């Protein structure tokens, strides 16, 4: 140090000619001795003596180019070989019994990894029985098998998420492309509609008015037909009402030559005027049919009623009684008994 101070004190304002040659020479021996003593004596102490000050700020410091001290190298290490281990080998790490920091990791062999992969493909959930069976078959501890399955399951989930993400991304791209195509088609169709509307308005402006007029005329014709049918119905109903409102015609007057006695019973009176002896209704009925049988001849006839007018000039009471009995005979009213029994000779003898 004294020599350095003397050299610095005797230095001229300008550098001597051999200054560069002196700077390229190695450090003095006493500096190297001090560095070796510091490394060897303290045994890896972190504090080092400061390097000598640089004589010139423009020249590189030779002390910075020196190799790093050997104190940073890990003692008893494997030389950084753990960084080159694969994922499958790292899955099998974990130490046999929870070892310390300096314990070397145990790596799985290729055959063990293949066996574990086949077991994981069969089922990603590890049961205690299967865990113990795999540990015995592979010569591993159950904790190592459980840790490997846990790490493998995490990687499998990550890969599944990546696959799902890729599938969703493809679906999104396809949906966007389809949406863009639909939007372009929609705009094209809108343009065609606008063009068609403009062409129709320019070329056939009167066509729409003609169609509207024809439609209005058709509506008017339908209205007229409806009104005509309604008027016809009203006329028919008025005629029916008039016919109903008219009084019934009076009956025709009776002829003047007809007697008031026969005016009520014209048919029976004509029958009653047959002769003095009268007309027998049963005889008229028998004449129209077959000839009377012997039984009919021998059997006495039922009591007859003479409808003719008697010689004593019986009035309208006798004619009305005869008409009533004749109507009862024709209608089958045989249960009613006549008020009197007429005689066939036509003369009544009153004693």
Curated annotation (Swiss-Prot):
Alphabetical list of Gene3D superfamilies matching this protein: Homeodomain-like
Record localization: Nucleus
Key words of the record: DNA-binding, Homeobox, Nucleus, Transcription, Transcription regulation
One GO cellular component term noted in the UniProt record for this chain: nucleus
CDD domains: homeodomain
GO molecular function: DNA-binding transcription factor activity, RNA polymerase II-specific; sequence-specific DNA binding
Tissue: Expressed in seedlings, roots, stems, leaf sheaths and panicles.
Amino acid composition bias (Polar residues), ranges on this chain: 228-240
Compositionally biased tracts (Pro residues): 247-257
Homology family: Belongs to the HD-ZIP homeobox family. Class I subfamily.
Designated name of the protein: Homeobox-leucine zipper protein HOX23
